[in-house]
Curated annotation (Swiss-Prot):
EC number: 3.-.-.-
Lineage: Eukaryota, Fungi, Dikarya, Ascomycota, Pezizomycotina
Positions of the catalytic residues: C102, H185, E187
Protein family (similarity comment): Belongs to the peptidase C26 family.
Signal peptide: none
Name by which UniProt lists this protein: Glutamine amidotransferase-like protein chry6
Entry annotated with the keyword Hydrolase: yes
Amino acid sequence: MSSPSFRVAILANFILDDTGGRPMIDKITQLIRQSKPDAEINVYAAIEGDTLPDPETKDLIILTGGPFNLLKDERPKWVVDTLEYLKTVTAGPSKPKILGICWGQQAIALALGGALGKSDKGQIVGIADIPLTPEGTKFFESPSLTIHKNHEILVTDIGPHLLPLALNNEVLMSKDGQVLTFQGHPEMDSVLSRLFVASDNPVLVGAGSDSGLKPIDSPHDGEIIFERIVRWASPETAHS
């Protein structure tokens, strides 16, 4: 008897037909299927009115990046619903793994009692080398990760339920191991990143001498990171 498929929900926090929307979903799907070819992957866009999935039917719930500014006091219903959903799923009896990417990390941090702020560097675009904490080094079996970045908002307070796996809250994990988040974009490559870059100015794409970032066509660890994500989220390797 075959084992059940690896069940994944992608919560898209952007309009799917906006620039880069469907290519981003396609890239996440591709990265998952490199490790789990038979994965059952469904996309839910609360921003377009979709109902968020029953967590008991999922092994992994992925919150994508998105354009809505979570520092705003007034939040649309879909954002409020997403934050409440995160509180419910992390407190409930079913424990699917939850992955947050960029906006997804920020939403998870807010839902779990953390706080956000703006980067004093402005919009950060490029590829960064992220030093890991001892816990992060053990989890990823590496002292650092190289990852795409494209954000201005960041987590300033991780709250009571999250632990840092990298310096500057770049990677977080919940104390119970259910939640893993990245401020960067492990799903991005240079083609996808270029869709979200508004200018060819080399500073904006990581080539500026003072940026500390590499250009978006530099090598990165996206595939390695996603392989580790899938292994972490898979029921048969949930403790590895």
